Swiss-Prot record:
This is UPF0173 metal-dependent hydrolase STK_14180. PANTHER family: UPF0173 METAL-DEPENDENT HYDROLASE MJ1163 (PTHR43546:SF3), UPF0173 METAL-DEPENDENT HYDROLASE MJ1163-RELATED (PTHR43546). Belongs to the UPF0173 family. InterPro entries: Metallo-B-lactamas (IPR001279), RibonucZ/Hydroxyglut_hydro (IPR036866), UPF0173 (IPR022877), UPF0173_UPF0282_UlaG_hydrolase (IPR050114). Keywords: Hydrolase. It comes from Sulfurisphaera tokodaii (strain DSM 16993 / JCM 10545 / NBRC 100140 / 7). The lineage of its organism: Archaea, Thermoproteota, Thermoprotei, Sulfolobales, Sulfolobaceae.
Length: 227
C-alpha cells in the first residue's frame, strides 16, 4: 500500500511503487522532524528538491552521500550547481524543468511552476505518480492562476500546499488553490508552525477547504496516511 508521511515543514516521505522517496529533506535543522538523518542511510531511492532555499534543499547533499544508489530529481540548473559545488555525479541526477512526465523506473515525475524566489534556479512544485496515485507537492509558492492547469493536466489525488503565509500562501489563499487544483482525495497543509514567523491555525485551512466542497487532512509531524 503506498504511503505518505509528513516529516514537518515541507519535508515529505513517500513509499510508492516500491520506491522510498523524500521531498525537500530538511531534517537536521527541522525542529519538528520525527526522524534523524541516519534513518535514511542506505534507505532512499530518490530525493526531490523543489528549490534551493535552505529549508527545502536541506540535507540533500549529505543524503546523496549516505545513499550512494539514490537519484536526485530537480531542475537542471539546481543540479548543475550541486554537481559543481558538491561533486554530486551527473549520472545520479534526473535533470528536468517545468514540463511533462519523466519515467523513473515505473514512477512518473514532473516539475511545475511555483511563484517564489530561489538563488540558483527557478522554484518549482513536483508531481509524483505511481500505483494509481498522483501527488502534487507545491514547494514554496504564492497563489497563481495556472494551478487550474496543474489540476487539469495532472489530476492529483493529494495536494500538499504551504499555508504559513508571509513567504507562501496563507490558509485562505491555499484553500482557493485547492478549489483550482480539484484534488480527488485530500489537501494536506505543509510549511507552517515550524517557526513563529509562519505560525497559523491549520483548522482555518480545513474550514476554508470544506466551504469549497473539498476535504483537508491535517497531519502531525511523523504521521502517515495510506494513499
Amino acid at each position: 500500500m503506498p504511503q505518505l508521511r509528513w516529516l514537518g515543514h515541507a519535508a515529505v516521505e513517500l513509499n510508492l511503487g516500491g520506491k522510498h522517496i523524500v521531498i525537500d529533506p530538511m531534517i537536521k535543522d527541522n525542529p519538528v522532524s520525527p526522524v534523524k538523518l541516519n534513518y535514511f542511510e542506505n534507505n532512499l531511492n530518490l530525493i526531490i528538491v523543489t528549490h534551493d532555499h535552505y529549508d527545502h534543499l536541506g540535507d540533500t547533499v549529505e543524503l546523496m552521500k549516505i545513499n550512494p544508489k539514490a537519484y536526485l530529481f530537480a531542475t537542471y540548473d539546481l543540479e548543475n550547481y550541486l554537481a559543481t559545488q558538491f561533486n554530486i555525479p551527473w549520472e545520479r541526477m534526473i535533470p528536468a524543468n517545468v514540463g511533462g512526465y519523466i519515467d523513473f523506473d515505473g514512477i512518473k515525475l514532473a516539475l511545475t511552476k511555483a511563484v517564489h524566489s530561489s538563488e540558483h534556479s527557478d522554484p518549482t512544485g513536483a508531481i509524483v505518480s505511481g500505483e494509481g496515485v498522483t501527488i502534487y507537492h507545491a514547494g514554496d509558492t504564492g497563489l497563481f492562476e495556472d494551478m487550474k492547469l496543474i489540476g487539469e493536466i495532472f489530476k492529483p489525488d493529494y495536494v500538499l500546499l504551504p499555508i504559513g503565509g508571509r513567504f507562501t500562501m496563507d490558509p485562505y489563499q491555499a484553500a482557493i488553490a485547492v478549489e483550482m487544483l480539484k484534488p480527488k482525495k485530500y489537501a494536506i497543509p505543509i510549511h507552517y508552525n515550524t517557526w513563529d514567523l509562519i505560525k497559523v491555525d491549520p483548522n482555518d485551512f480545513v474550514k476554508e477547504v470544506s466551504k469549497r466542497g473539498y476535504k483537508a487532512l491535517v497531519l502531525q509531524p511523523g504521521q502517515s496516511v495510506e494513499l
